[in-house]
Structures are given as C-alpha cells and as structure tokens.
Design a protein with these regions (language model features):
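Core of compact, soluble alpha-helical bundle domains
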Residues: 1-144
Length: 144
C-alpha cells in the first residue's frame, strides 16, 4: 500500500536510489511487456546493469560523480534485434513512476519522473521507427 504524500520522504540518498532501482527492476523482470526485452533480447546481466543504473540515477538526481554509460548504444543494439515500440516506453515509465510513488514524494522524486520521460523521448526519437510521444497517461485522450 502506498503511503500518503505527506508521510513519504523524498529521494535523498544513494541508499534511496539503490532501493528505487532494485524495486523497479523487480517489477520489470516479471512484467509481460518488458521482461522479454530485458531477459531474452538484451540478455541483461543484472550484476552489472543494476549498479550502473544506480550510479546513473545518483549522478542525475543527487549530483554524485559517475559515468553516464552508453544509454543510446545499448538501446540501439536491442532495437536492431527486436524493435522497441511505444508500449515498451509507456510500460517502462509507468513502472518507474509506480516504483517512485510507492515510497517517495517530493521535488527529487518528481525530477526522477521528469528525467525518465526525457530519457525515453530522446532514446525513442533517436532509434527511428519508434514514435513514442511520451507516457500515454499524459496525452490528451491517450492519443499518440
């Protein structure tokens, strides 16, 4: 059960980011839409992927030093094998938002959501053939 906004802390520490990333990927690995992309197509090595994403989000949200990694290159590789579709990006954002909202609320939490939309938009735009117009929930009438 999600705590009320008034009782949820904001994302503030590396431990918070760790917990968020782990909670998010726990959902991803069992998700009907995303699990096949991560496990069958990308063959994700979770032992390296999780720490890399923790570093990435700590850099973005907390200003901690760290590498940005090759976000676009890895997504291009996956897209070449099995094209990513708007529903992949919609689901990714929905799970990310839900993972945040389950435990955190505040300016940094909102920044994490906004940044995820920007990342998704940039990646989808640069992949070609993936006309993602942002999360379905934010589009008027759910139109693409």
């Amino acid at each position: 059960m999600t705590a009320s906004v008034e009782t949820r802390p904001d994302l503030a520490t590396r431990a918070d980011i760790h917990d968020l990333v782990v909670a998010f990927y726990r959902e991803v690995v069992f998700d009907d839409v995303l699990a096949p992309v991560f496990t069958e197509v990308a063959e994700t090595d979770w032992s390296t992927h999780i720490p890399r994403l923790i570093d990435y989000w700590c850099r973005v949200l907390l200003g901690q030093p760290g590498s940005t990694g090759a976000l676009l290159a890895s997504h291009r590789h996956v897209h070449a094998i099995e094209p990513l579709r708007p529903e992949h990006f919609d689901r990714w954002v929905a799970l990310w938002f839900a993972s945040i909202d389950e435990r955190w609320a505040g300016p940094t939490s909102e920044q994490a959501k906004a940044h995820a939309i920007r990342v998704g938009s940039v990646i989808a735009g640069r992949l070609g053939g993936c006309p993602w117009a942002g999360p379905a929930a934010t589009r008027v009438g759910g139109q693409r």
